[in-house]
Amino acid sequence: MAKKSKIVKNNKRRDIVARYAQRRAELKQIIQSPTSSYEQRLDAQRALSRQPRDASAVRLRNRDAIDGRPRGHLRKFGLSRVRVRELAHAGQLPGVRKASW
């Protein structure tokens, strides 16, 4: 079980990323565009650097949806490997079967 404060902090980051996502995408497009002038790129880079650090999606951490475990996250289920194993053995994940060959 992860600390509640870490889970809450990650959720706040997720909200901040969603709030700034469109503006960040616009600025990045200006920076990467070959048609934009040097001054436009410089202004876009400055505007991007003025945004909050937590507005970057790279700072998000994938966590287990049930207990917030930060490691061993399986995207397909949104759970950690430990939780997937427990739920699969209990038959609570539809369509998941133990391998047999």
UniProtKB/Swiss-Prot annotation:
**Where in the chain are disulfide-linked cysteines found?**
none
Looking at the keywords, is Lipoprotein present?
no
* Coiled-coil segments on the chain, per record: none
Q: Which GO terms describe its molecular function?
A: rRNA binding; structural constituent of ribosome
Q: Which residues form the signal peptide?
A: none
The answer to whether keyword Chloroplast applies is no
Q: Which parts of this chain are annotated as the region Disordered?
A: 35-56
**Any single Gene Ontology cellular-component annotation:** small ribosomal subunit
Biological process annotations from GO:
translation
Assigned protein family: Belongs to the universal ribosomal protein uS14 family.
Provide the function of this protein. Answer: Binds 16S rRNA, required for the assembly of 30S particles and may also be responsible for determining the conformation of the 16S rRNA at the A site.
Q: How does it assemble?
A: Part of the 30S ribosomal subunit. Contacts proteins S3 and S10.
Family matches, as HAMAP family:
Ribosomal_uS14_1 (MF_00537)
What is the protein's name according to its record?
A: Small ribosomal subunit protein uS14A
Q: Which organism is it from?
A: Mycobacterium marinum (strain ATCC BAA-535 / M)
Q: Which gene encodes it?
A: rpsN
